[in-house]
Amino acid sequence: MSSSTQLVRAVIPVLDLMIGQIVLAKAGNRDEYRPVETPLTFSSQPLEVAKAMFNQTCCDWLYLADIDSFAGASPNWNVYNELLNHGFGLWIDANWMIDDRYRHIHEKIESPERLEIILSSETLSSLDQFSTFTQLIEKGIQPIFSLDRKSGQTITQPGELSELAPIELVKEAYNRGVRSLIVLDLDSVGTMKGIQNKDVGVGPLIQEIKQELSDLRIISGGGIREVEDVKSLLDAGCQHVLVASAIHELKLTPDDVMEFPVSPFDLGSGRSLN
């Protein structure tokens, strides 16, 4: 296995960072986020929560949403570096389009070899901005495109993207070199309402994307309540599933997670090796 190849478990624990603490997200309503209360740890500090979630799942790659950045605050570089320096791999969503802050990643991040950058649809307004994916790849940073959905619609900034079908946005990112995609129903986040089957919610969209672009690494989540929900998304074509509440509610154990496939992923090319 080459030095750029990472083994990534199917479950990706989620950290929502707000005012220096980990909060529990619910249905994408950021005004209602509160510091996490979890039996895993007495702390809401990022590193302590990350270590506690690792102890519960044995998953060392994390999805980190920097909530304050979406209100215009600067990225929390200190937290990113603290987690990376403790051996975690990070997928970071930090509204990278504001002031072209993605251009500062190399000077701010101390260990970029276990870092992937998420560009979410809600931060993009034009097709021209998709060139950012290419720029990141040229700098050796693997981007992930996040297709954010709410009330059955894709969330974008006002502009031409709001007129495009989800599959068109995904294809545009794919044509710019993206090989990892998040499909996320924000209405389901933090609700633990479960995944019914592959024919509802984001299921049909995931199937459409897999048929069109079979080599995409697809990630989804939202509403996960138990092991069977993780299995449902994996069966629908996902390689990874984002989970927060179910971990804090002790619905997933290390033994559960070990039963799911591990995906070798080449950070150099951005491709899943399965």
Predicted regions and their residues:
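Catalytic cores of alpha/beta
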Residues: 89-113, 117, 126-133, 204-240
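Catalytic domains of carbohydrate-active enzymes, especially glycoside hydrolases
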Residues: 50-65, 175-181
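Hydrophobic faces of well-ordered beta-strands that scaffold small-molecule active sites
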Residues: 9-18, 62-64, 90-94, 115-119, ...
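Short catalytic helix/loop segments, enriched in acidic residues and glycine
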Residues: 29-51
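N-terminal active-site wall of soluble small-molecule enzyme domains
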Residues: 55-109, 202-203
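Charged helix-capping and loop-helix junction motifs
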Residues: 74-80, 159-168, 194-207
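C-terminal helical cap(s) of enzyme catalytic domains, especially alpha/beta-barrels
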Residues: 130-133, 234-274
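Conserved anion-binding
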Residues: 14-37, 103-190
